């Protein structure tokens, strides 16, 4: 997925397997997304933005891990809200492409 190594994805998912253990910074670093080009980050955004609205909404964030591996757990409500708050720089309740890119590189 996203041109990432399968072993890195597996390790990153394993590290946040327990409920409420997801940390976006640690996850992006572990899967190798932090080092990806702007083009690759945009491709990832477009996949996560399932309804193609140009934004990643709360419901799409909740299923974030499943974009990396089918059958991965959904994020808890608490994790989803923390993730959304971290990425939603303008406070509109959703994450745009620029906000997502900043979140990945943070």
From Swiss-Prot:
Domain of life of the source: Eukaryota
InterPro entries: EF-hand-dom_pair, EF_Hand_1_Ca_BS, EF_hand_dom, Parvalbumin
SUPFAM superfamilies linked to this entry: EF-hand (SSF47473)
Keyword set includes Repeat: yes
Domain EF-hand: 36-71, 75-106
Modified residues (N-acetylalanine): 1
Record: residues binding Ca(2+) 1: 49, 51, 53, 55, 57, 60
Keyword Flavoprotein belongs to the record: no
Alphabetical UniProt keywords: Acetylation, Calcium, Metal-binding, Muscle protein, Repeat
Pfam family of the protein (one): EF-hand_7
Any one annotated GO CC term: cytoplasm
Record-listed Ca(2+) 2 binding positions: 88, 90, 92, 94, 99
GO molecular function terms attached to this record: calcium ion binding
Family from the record: Belongs to the parvalbumin family.
PANTHER family attached to this UniProt entry: PARVALBUMIN, PARVALBUMIN ALPHA
Free-text function comment from the UniProt entry: In muscle, parvalbumin is thought to be involved in relaxation after contraction. It binds two calcium ions.
Name under which the protein is recorded: Parvalbumin beta
Lineage: Eukaryota, Metazoa, Chordata, Craniata, Vertebrata
């Amino acid at each position: 997925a996203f041109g990432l190594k399968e072993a890195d994805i597996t390790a990153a998912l394993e590290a946040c397997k327990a409920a409420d253990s997801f940390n976006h910074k640690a996850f992006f670093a572990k899967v190798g997304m932090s080092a990806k080009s702007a083009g690759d980050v945009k491709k990832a955004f477009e996949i996560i933005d399932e309804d193609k609205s140009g934004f990643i909404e709360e419901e799409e964030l909740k299923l974030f891990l499943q974009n990396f591996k089918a059958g991965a757990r959904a994020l808890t409500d608490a994790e989803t809200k923390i993730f959304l708050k971290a990425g939603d720089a303008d406070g509109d309740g959703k994450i745009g492409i620029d906000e997502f890119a900043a979140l990945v590189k943070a």
